[in-house]
Design a protein with these regions (language model features):
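ATP-binding N-terminal substructure of ATP-dependent carboxylate-amine bond-forming enzymes
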Residues: 1-108, 113, 139
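Short, solvent-exposed amphipathic alpha-helical segments in soluble enzyme
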Residues: 20-24, 183, 207, 219
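CheY-like receiver
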Residues: 67-71, 144, 177-180
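A conserved helix-loop-beta module that forms one wall/lid of the active-site cleft
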Residues: 97-165, 171
Length: 276
C-alpha cells in the first residue's frame, strides 16, 4: 500500500471530492491533515480515511511536517504528501523537502505562487506578459501609472483567482485599490497594465515533463468584470474540440510556460488574453 497524505485545511465541497477520490484509489492508504475536525466529513468519506491529524494552521510547514510524521508512525512510510488549493503549495513543498518525499520543489511552487516572479520568468523567456511592477508605496504606484497609463489592474502578488483584485481608472481609484489589495498581500501590491480582449484558461495534466491532457476554456465575461458587477451570471465555455487553429497559440504558450517555470508532474491552470 502507498501511504498518501492529503492536506485539506478546511473540508470544502471541493476538498471532500478530492479526499474521497484519492482515498478510493487502488493501493492507497490515506492519511488526512486538516484544521477542521474529522466529524465535519460525511460518514462515507470518514470510513475511507486511515489516519487523521488535526492541526492549528494547515498552511504552516512545521504543522504539516509534525502531522505527517504522526501519520507515518501509524500507517508506515509515506509515499506522497499533496493538496490542491493554491495557497498551500509553498508550505507543502517545504514539508515535502523536509520529509524526503518526491514532488514539486519549494522553488517551483514559489514561481507559480508569486505572480511577480512568474511574470518576470515568462517575460525573460520571451513569452507575452502584461507590463507589471511590484510596488510598496503609493508614490511608486503612481509612477508606474504615469509610465503605463490607465486603466490598471491592482492585486496582491500571491493572490488566488480574482480575490482582492481591482481595476483603477485614475489616481483616486488607484489609491483606493491599493488599500484593498494590501489586505491580501502583506503590504506589497502587484500592478499590471489593463489588457482588453478575450480571456481563456489553459488547464492540463503533466507527467514526467510530458503533457498527457490539456483543455482550453473561455470566460464570458472576464472574471474582473464579474468581480466589479456581482449581479452578472458569468459563463465558462468549454469547447468540445480544442484542436482548432484558434487555440494553437494558447496551447503553445501554455506548454512553453511549464518548461520555464519548472513543473515536471502535476496539474496546472493558467489564464491567457487574446487582445482585441
Amino acid at each position: 500500500m502507498h501511504v498518501i497524505v492529503f492536506v485539506a485545511p478546511y473540508f470544502t465541497e471541493n476538498a471532500r471530492r478530492f479526499i474521497q477520490v484519492t482515498a478510493s484509489l487502488p493501493g492507497v492508504a490515506l492519511g488526512l491533515i486538516s484544521q477542521d475536525p474529522i466529524d465535519f466529513l460525511p460518514a462515507e468519506i470518514r470510513a475511507l480515511v486511515r489516519a487523521h491529524v488535526r492541526v492549528g494552521d494547515g498552511l504552516d510547514a512545521d504543522h504539516l511536517v509534525g502531522a505527517a510524521r504522526q501519520i507515518e508512525k501509524e500507517l508506515g512510510p509515506l509515499h506522497r504528501i499533496l493538496g490542491v488549493i493554491e495557497q498551500i503549495q509553498e508550505p507543502l513543498a517545504e514539508a515535502r523537502a523536509r520529509l524526503g518525499l518526491a514532488g514539486m520543489s519549494a522553488d517551483v511552487a514559489r514561481s507559480f505562487r508569486d505572480k511577480t516572479r512568474m511574470k518576470d520568468a515568462l517575460r525573460a523567456a520571451g513569452l507575452p506578459v502584461a507590463r507589471h511592477r511590484l510596488v510598496i508605496d503609493d508614490e511608486a504606484a503612481l509612477r508606474f501609472a504615469g509610465e503605463v497609463g490607465y486603466p490598471l489592474v491592482v492585486k496582491p502578488p500571491a493572490g488566488a483567482a480574482s480575490q482582492d483584485t481591482f481595476r483603477a481608472d485614475d489616481d483616486a481609484s488607484l489609491r483606493k485599490a491599493l488599500v484593498g489589495a494590501r489586505s491580501g498581500g502583506g503590504g506589497a501590491v502587484l500592478l499590471e497594465e489593463f489588457v482588453t480582449g478575450e480571456e481563456y484558461s489553459f488547464d492540463g495534466l503533466i507527467l514526467n515533463g510530458k503533457v498527457g491532457f490539456q483543455s482550453v476554456s473561455h470566460y464570458d465575461p472576464a472574471p474582473l468584470t464579474v468581480m466589479q458587477n456581482p449581479w452578472i451570471q458569468w459563463m465558462v465555455v468549454l469547447p468540445r474540440e480544442v484542436d482548432a487553429p484558434d487555440f494553437d497559440a494558447i496551447k503553445a504558450a501554455g506548454t512553453r510556460s511549464l518548461a520555464v517555470l519548472g513543473l515536471e508532474t502535476g496539474m496546472w491552470h493558467m489564464e491567457w488574453f487574446r487582445r482585441r
